[in-house]
Amino acid sequence: MMPLLDKLREQYGVGPLCSELHIAPSTYYHCQQQRHHPDKRSARAQRDDWLKKEIQRVYDENHKVYGVRKVWRQLLREGIRVARCTVARLMAVMGLAGVLRGKKVRTTISRKAVAAGDRVNRQFVAERPDQLWVADFTYVSTWQGFVYVAFIIDVFAGYIVGWRVSSSMETTFVLDALEQALWARRPSGTVHHSDKGSQYVSLAYTQRLKEAGLLASTGSTGDSYDNAMAESINGLYKAKVIHRKSWKNRAEVELATLTWVDWYNNRRLLERLGHTPPAEAEKAYYASIGNDDLAA
C-alpha cells in the first residue's frame, strides 16, 4: 500500500489519499521514516528483518519443503535462538509453507506362494545400523511415460543405502538398488524386509540376498502397515520432489533423486533422531561404541 501512496501523493496529496484508504496520515509518515531510516526501527522489527533472511536461506537450502517445525529446528542447530511461534509468524508473513504428502498408489504384483516369512511383524526398530533394511519402489509419471524409483533404507537412522531409477519394473532394477546398498555397506546377517511384490520375491532377488548373507522378510501384500517405513520414505519423496513439477524423462528424475537422497541422508532433520540427519546419527552411534573408522 505504501508504494501506491508514494506514487500518488504528488497528484492527490497524502491527506486525501489516507482518508480514502481509512488510514491515519501519521501511519504513512511513520512507515516512511522506517523505510528511509531502518536503524531507527524497533529492535524487534530489525531482528525480524534479519530472521526473515535466515528463514528464507534455510527454506531454500532444504528444497523449499520445510515447514515451521523443521525450519525452527535447523535454526536452533545453527545456534540461532528463536521461538517457534516467531518462526511461524514470520513464515506466514513471507508466504512460506512446508509440503504435504499425498497418498501412495499401489504398484505391488503379488507372488505369495514363494514369499519369505515376516521377520519384522511391523516392528520397524533397530538398535544399530545394518540390522534391518526395508525396500520398496514407487512410480513417477514423465512426458515419456512412467519411470520407477526403488529405495533401500536402513531402519536404524533412516539412511537410504541404495536406490535406482528405471524405465521398467523388471527385477533387475530393484537388484541394482540392492547391489548399490551391498557395495556401500558390506552387511552381514541384515534382515531385508519388503512387500510380496514379484520383483522382491523373484528367484534372482532372493538368491542374491542369500549369497550376500541377508535374511529375507516380507509383509502382506496391499497392507501399507507391513512395510510402513519404506512406504513412508516413498510418500516423502513423492511429496517433496515429484509432485512439485512435471518431469520430462528418466534422466531428469534421476538427477533430482540423486540430489534429494544426498539432502535426505546428510542434511534433513529427523525428529526421532533428536532432530539430526541420518548420517550424523549413524556416526554418533559408531563413536559411542568406539568404532573410530566408521565414526569419522
From Swiss-Prot:
Residues 125-285 form the Integrase catalytic domain. The keyword DNA-binding applies. Pfam families: HTH_21 (PF13276), rve (PF00665), rve_2 (PF13333). Signal peptide: none annotated. Keywords: DNA recombination, DNA-binding, Transposable element, Transposition. The keyword DNA-binding applies. One of its GO terms (molecular function) is DNA binding. GO terms for biological process: DNA integration; DNA recombination; transposition. NCBIfam families: transpos_IS3 (NF033516). Involved in the transposition of the insertion sequence. This is Transposase for insertion sequence element IS629. It comes from Shigella sonnei. The lineage of its organism: Bacteria, Pseudomonadati, Pseudomonadota, Gammaproteobacteria, Enterobacterales.
